[in-house]
């Protein structure tokens, strides 16, 4: 008995010749979802939000007060035109101000509160600038005892964020003098336009018996007052009970190209080949002493457990530590440059990113090319399209869209003679790969329009994309509608040339679907997802010999006669879940498959 049976469906292994694939593997797969072993499609993308800015390419969601943050249908969307924008929430437990932070390659680091964002109010430059110089004079003292002290000032935002201290003003006076302090003026734009400064703090020194000099808080005044004068008569004994100055080195961040939240409340950022770290739980404070200079320019950052993964134009770097002042780095052995920031995806398994050689997974101190077994370097080069990859985590899969992918075209109407050619098609096509699931392997993805960006929603972990002026959700909950998909089998070789007589395709259930037209058996038909469930195409020795519409599970389809062939391929184009397929050289044999 000669028969072809497909009880299970798997993804592509493009590095293996289509004649040598395992029986379940596809030579071509597009929009297929293969986790169950059945032939299924990716979910239809569900609209969540219509963009206010038609030029926006990426959007992030912040929750509404009192709502479940993971509920995808509620929230305020924050839109950006630069696809390379990073957007994070405050790494502070129960942040009373509900602050959010963002930066990109074209904008300086900024932040805002959720309330202000919902009201459409502008954000502020991240960080608190250094206060200007102050001036001190003395008068009124009669004591012969002299005292030397230094004064500094700091600026404080409405949210309690304190900046670095001003240059110290050193003065000597009598111990009972009144020290007249003229506090620094504040730039008017810092009082609610580019910054949100509300207070000025004044500190002065006390020298301990051991000779240690420490700054203590003298007073805090309203920054909105135009001329700030303060007369200091506080004794050292009283001052010693006041708070200490902590923010001496809490400088604002440079123009970071990107950042990410590390464990222990540290925010890591980068520009060029410099790696920067904030104070723990203080994302406004970025001491320059904490910055590290790396060998290669940084492309982007990822996180795996307690470790920061730095993807560069050379070797990947890992960085770890619980204190931003003592972060240690390790250069991994593999020279695997990162092609694009958008390709970086942080997962439980590690950090994925695209290199010229394939998709790289960094974990446990090593970098592994996980597509090496699936895809040749030449094919990967056309898929990666010079790094134009934007990706997210769909279930356990790496789900990406690119600026151009290999597209299979043919001489005739259908995909009868595949020729791989690189066609620039914007970002309407991409791929899905899951190295943790051998059945899934690799599959192409396709949309009807350009996908501007792919992200994981920070509140739910769900994949969202921006397309056609909308934010869309890939909803994998049970019962989802599926996209039309294409799956083409390996080339099956029979022992000698034969003519297959008939086949059956088994669907999951008998879907309730109203067919407006007669069942189509035209070999030149094209699949219409609006009026059809599935088409099965059969190829013999590379030639399309049958294309028939399938309407019911297990219905019998006869194949044309008058020829024999030794190499057979089966192609499904459908929007219904397929359980299995059977094809034999006679009706009797088909009943025994």
Walk through the language-model features, giving the residues of each.
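Loop/turn segments within WD40 beta-propeller blades
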Residues: 302-304, 344-348
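Beta-sheet repeat architectures centered on beta-propellers
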Residues: 2-104, 148, 158-160, 173-178, ...
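Surface-exposed extracellular loop regions of Gram-negative outer-membrane beta-barrel proteins
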Residues: 308-333
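Surface-exposed loop/turn positions within WD40 beta-propeller blades
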Residues: 97, 105-106, 264, 272-273, ...
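Beta-strand initiation motifs
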Residues: 162, 211-213, 239-241, 283-286, ...
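Disordered, low-complexity "stalk" and linker segments at domain junctions of extracellular
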Residues: 2-30, 35-40, 45, 54, ...
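WD40 beta-propeller blade core
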Residues: 276, 317-318, 360, 472
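Surface loop/turn motifs at the tips and blade-to-blade linkers of beta-strand repeat domains
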Residues: 222-223, 290-294, 331-336, 381-382, ...
């Amino acid at each position: 008995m000669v028969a072809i049976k497909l009880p299970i469906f798997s993804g592509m292994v493009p590095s293996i010749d289509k004649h040598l694939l395992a029986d379940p593997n596809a030579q071509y797969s597009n929009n297929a979802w293969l986790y169950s072993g059945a032939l299924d499609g990716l979910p239809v993308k569900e609209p969540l939000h219509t963009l206010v800015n038609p030029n926006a390419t990426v959007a992030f969601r912040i929750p509404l007060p009192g709502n479940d943050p993971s509920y995808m249908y509620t929230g305020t969307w924050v839109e950006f035109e630069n696809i390379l924008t990073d957007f994070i929430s405050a790494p502070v437990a129960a942040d009373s101000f509900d602050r959010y932070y963002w930066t990109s390659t074209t904008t300086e680091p900024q932040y805002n509160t959720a309330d202000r964002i919902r009201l459409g109010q502008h954000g502020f430059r991240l960080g608190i600038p250094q206060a200007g110089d102050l001036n001190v004079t003395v008068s009124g003292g009669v004591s012969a005892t002299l005292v030397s002290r230094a004064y500094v000032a700091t600026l404080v935002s409405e949210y309690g964020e304190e900046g670095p201290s001003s240059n110290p003003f050193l003065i000597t006076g009598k111990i009972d003098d009144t020290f007249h302090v003229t506090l620094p003026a504040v730039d008017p734009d810092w009082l609610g336009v580019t910054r949100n400064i509300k207070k000025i703090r004044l500190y002065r020194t006390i020298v301990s018996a051991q000779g240690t000099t420490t700054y203590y808080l003298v007073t805090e005044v309203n920054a909105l007052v135009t001329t700030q004068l303060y007369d200091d008569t506080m004794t050292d004994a009283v001052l010693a009970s006041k708070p200490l100055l902590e923010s001496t080195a809490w400088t604002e961040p440079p123009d970071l190209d990107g950042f990410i939240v590390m464990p222990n409340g540290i925010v890591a950022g980068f520009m060029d080949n410099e790696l920067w770290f904030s104070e723990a739980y203080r994302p406004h404070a970025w001491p320059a002493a904490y910055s590290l200079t790396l060998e290669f320019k940084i492309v982007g950052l990822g996180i795996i457990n307690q470790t920061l993964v730095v993807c560069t134009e050379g070797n990947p770097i890992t960085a770890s530590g619980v204190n931003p002042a003592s972060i240690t780095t390790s250069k991994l052995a593999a020279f695997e440059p990162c092609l694009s920031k958008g390709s970086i995806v942080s997962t439980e398994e590690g950090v994925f990113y695209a290199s010229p050689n394939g998709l790289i997974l960094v974990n446990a101190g090593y970098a592994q090319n996980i597509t090496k077994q699936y895809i040749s370097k030449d094919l990967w080069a056309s898929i990666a399209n010079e790094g134009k990859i934007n990706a997210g985590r769909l279930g356990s899969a790496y789900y990406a869209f690119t600026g151009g992918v290999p597209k299979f075209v043919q001489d005739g109407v259908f995909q009868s003679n595949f020729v791989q050619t690189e066609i620039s098609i914007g970002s309407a096509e991409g791929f899905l790969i899951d190295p943790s699931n051998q059945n899934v392997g690799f599959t192409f993805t396709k949309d009807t329009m350009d996908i501007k960006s792919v992200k994981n929603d920070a509140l739910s972990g769900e994949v969202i994309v921006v397309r056609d002026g909308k934010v869309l959700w890939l909803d994998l909950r049970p019962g989802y509608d599926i996209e039309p998909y294409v799956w083409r089998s390996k080339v099956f070789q029979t022992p000698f040339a034969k003519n297959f007589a008939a086949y059956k395709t088994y669907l999951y259930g008998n879907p309730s679907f109203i067919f407006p037209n007669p069942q189509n058996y035209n070999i030149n038909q094209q699949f219409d997802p609006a009026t059809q469930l599935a088409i099965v195409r059969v190829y013999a020795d590379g030639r399309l010999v049958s294309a028939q519409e399938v309407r019911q599970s297990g219905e019998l389809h006869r194949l044309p006669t008058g020829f024999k062939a030794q190499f057979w391929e089966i192609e499904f184009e459908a929007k219904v879940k397929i359980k299995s397929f059977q094809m034999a050289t006679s009706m009797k044999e088909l009943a025994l498959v």
